[in-house]
Design a protein with these regions (language model features):
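Extracytoplasmic/periplasmic, Sec-exported soluble proteins
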Residues: 51-55, 96-107, 152-160, 209-211
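Periplasmic OmpA-like peptidoglycan-binding domain that tethers envelope proteins to the cell wall
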Residues: 136-224
């Protein structure tokens, strides 16, 4: 009986150590899993700034380097959101007209091939979602106000961006450049929906519109960086 009780005690001790060993193994696996997840998150946190730097910051640096000496002469600025804004209406079109001025044509002749070269560079081409050519007018339309003025300006802004696209397509571009332009460029007329103040900022409630600065043409880049970041996070 003593031998039986002794063997039983040994068996219980063995079961205890086996159970303890299983718990330790499970804890080790749990810590290993946590470590792997943490490493993945750290890797993702490195990838996201890299994606941003290579795309948005890279485009900003290239555009600034390429055009910084020309922007002032063109009556243009490069915004932080990668928008190039041509803001001197007397250079762009005659009042109420959608015909490109000779001076604006000369600017586009110089600007656009260089701009397109940057967008189609292998560093950026797969990260460009679309490029919008936005046409904006002021809210002014002679003695006409309200809805009719808005609709007249809508028609004018749309016609102007359409004429810009038409002119760009007739530049000396190769077939690859033309096809890429047609797939990625959009011409949008905003009428007077986005007027600017004296500081060339979006008009806020209670501010006075600057009728001159509100009239502009913008080349606005939209990247797919958001989609790429979502892909990284969802992995």
């Amino acid at each position: 009986m003593k031998l039986f009780r002794k063997n039983k005690k040994i068996s219980e001790d063995d079961d205890f150590f086996i159970a303890l060993s299983d718990i330790m193994t499970a804890l080790m696996l749990l810590f290993l899993l946590i470590s792997v997840v943490y490493m993945i998150k750290v890797e993702d946190s490195v990838k996201i700034p890299k994606i941003f730097k290579e795309t948005t910051q890279g485009l900003s640096e290239h555009l600034n380097k390429e055009f910084e000496k020309d922007l002032k002469a063109w009556g243009a600025v490069l915004d932080k959101d990668l928008t190039i804004r041509f803001y001197q209406p007397d250079i762009l079109f005659k009042t109420g007209s959608d015909v490109l001025s000779p001076k604006f044509k000369n600017i586009l002749n110089d600007f656009f091939p260089r701009y397109l070269k940057i967008m189609m560079d292998k560093q950026f081409i797969n990260n460009i979602e679309e490029i919008r050519i936005d046409g904006h007018t002021s809210s002014f339309w002679g003695n006409i106000k309200g809805d009719i003025a808005y609709l007249n300006n809508m028609e004018l802004s749309q016609a102007r961006t359409r004429e810009v696209i038409k002119y760009l397509l007739n530049l000396n571009l190769n077939e690859e450049e033309k096809e890429w332009l047609k797939k990625h460029f959009r011409a949008i007329g905003f009428s007077s929906a986005k007027p600017l103040n004296d500081k060339s900022q979006t008009l806020q409630y209670g501010e006075k519109e600057n009728f001159i600065k509100s009239q502009r043409v913008e080349f606005r880049v939209r990247t797919n960086i958001e989609n790429k970041i979502v892909e990284v996070v969802d992995k």
